[in-house]
Amino acid sequence: MDAPGYLCTGTSDVLDLEAQVALIKAMQPEVKSIGILYTSSEDNSITNLKNFKAICDKEGIEVVATAVQGAADIPAAAEELASKVDCINNFTDNNVVNNLSVVLNAADKYKIPVYGSEEEQVVNGCLASVSIDYVALGKVTGEMAVSVLKGEDASAMPVKTITEATPVINSTEIGRA
């Protein structure tokens, strides 16, 4: 992504999945299974799931993945998933995040934590996340936009990725780990 091509560039919020798995293991040292609820039509979720499974395989952790098509599928899928795993981990799946309260309610029923993929999910009830700074990402994006507006060739600008991530913990949910 050093030179994406015709008038194309941007920024990326790639998840640090290795750090996320390390966080889950630190908070739940005995974790044996992690549930993933994802939307089958979101390419980002499919890619994250593949990478997450590879990391968990190395750690001896089973990933139980449940695909949904839309919001109407989430209540039953979240309930079923929560009944089978030690915790649930969210990606930046738009459909799932927009229905986070449903996932949290299912997890509450089985007294398991939900880990988020960014700080806002933790604010909304997830136990913890290794989160990138979306304000910093926005600033980098804005700086790139200014460069394009000043005449720089967007197609020659590499895509920039924010890689610094910070653990964020919801102290009111800490007992759930």
Each PLM stretch: what is its role?
Residues 2-33, 132-152:
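Hydrophobic alpha-helical segments within soluble ligand-binding/sensing domains
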Residues 120-172:
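Flexible loop/turn connectors
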Residues 34-37, 85-97, 115-117:
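Periplasmic-binding protein-like
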Residues 10-56, 158-173:
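An alpha-beta-alpha
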Residues 1, 103-127:
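Venus flytrap/periplasmic-binding-protein-like
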Residues 177:
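Conserved small/polar residues in nucleotide/adenosyl-binding loops
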Residues 7-8, 55-71:
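Short beta-strand elements in bilobed, periplasmic/extracellular small-molecule ligand-binding domains
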Residues 67-81:
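Structural motif
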